Amino acid sequence: MRDEHIPETTSLKRTLSVPLVTLYGLGTILGAGIYVLIGEVAGKAGIFAPVSFLIASVIAGFTAFSYAELSSRYPQSAGEAAYAQEAFSIHWISAAVGWSVVIIGSVSAATIANGFVGYFKIFIDTPDWLAITILVITLGIIAGWGITESITVASIITIIEILGLLSVIVIAGDSFAELPGRLEEFIPPLDAQAWLAVALGAFLAFYAFVGFEDIVNVAEEVK
């Protein structure tokens, strides 16, 4: 049921379609997380990496369902800060949550920008600071262009990311034929060391699933 404290009107333009928002959400989940972290998770969990991803996906799934429920009850662009305000009605708590989101977003953006340098230098050998500056300015211009335009660009990039993952699956298609006979190898033994490795891998793998929480921040701009 819609909360009576949430106003029906909004000053933001509702220009985003459901397909655009869906692609935007997929794009924030895919990308740097899934492409970069597979190797990191495998480094921690070894052959048990699929179990780490499975555990992380279950935890992320519960979190995603919580966001879906909250965003339907409180469709505000403030997202997590609005939810905290509705739950506790204490301004400093909602402010702390809001600033935490800003800080986390800044750290994540910086991390991804640093990771981008390695890929960029494959094509053009430039100083790290220059590559990061070009990326930040370019993305800033796209973001300032408008919500519909920027999410359209993000959706196009998402489609490219999905095609990239599908290409990997197709190229490695022959290897999947061996999986049924090797499933037992992916099940961790009842050993503390093995499950510790799985837990460490799951901790990293969770980052590969995050991104869905960004969708709630455009709730007031969806048609």
Stretch-by-stretch model annotation:
Residues M1-F48, G61, F65, S77:
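Membrane-interface "cap" regions at the ends of multi-pass membrane proteins
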Residues H5-K13, P50, D125-L130, I134, ...:
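Helix-loop-helix junctions that connect adjacent transmembrane segments
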Residues R14-G25, S89-I104, I134-L135, A192-A205:
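Select transmembrane alpha-helical segments in multipass membrane proteins
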Residues S17, G31, L70, I215-V218:
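Hydrophobic/aromatic residues within transmembrane alpha-helices of membrane transport systems
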Residues Y24, V51-I55, A96, V153-I160:
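Hydrophobic core positions of alpha-helical segments in small-molecule transporters
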Residues L26-L30, V58, I103-S106, F206-F209:
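Hydrophobic/aromatic residues within the transmembrane alpha-helices of Major Facilitator Superfamily
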Residues G33, W99-I103, V153-I156:
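Hydrophobic alpha-helical segments of secondary membrane carriers
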Residues E40-K44, S52, G61-V136, I141-G144, ...:
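Hydrophobic transmembrane alpha-helices that form the core helical bundles
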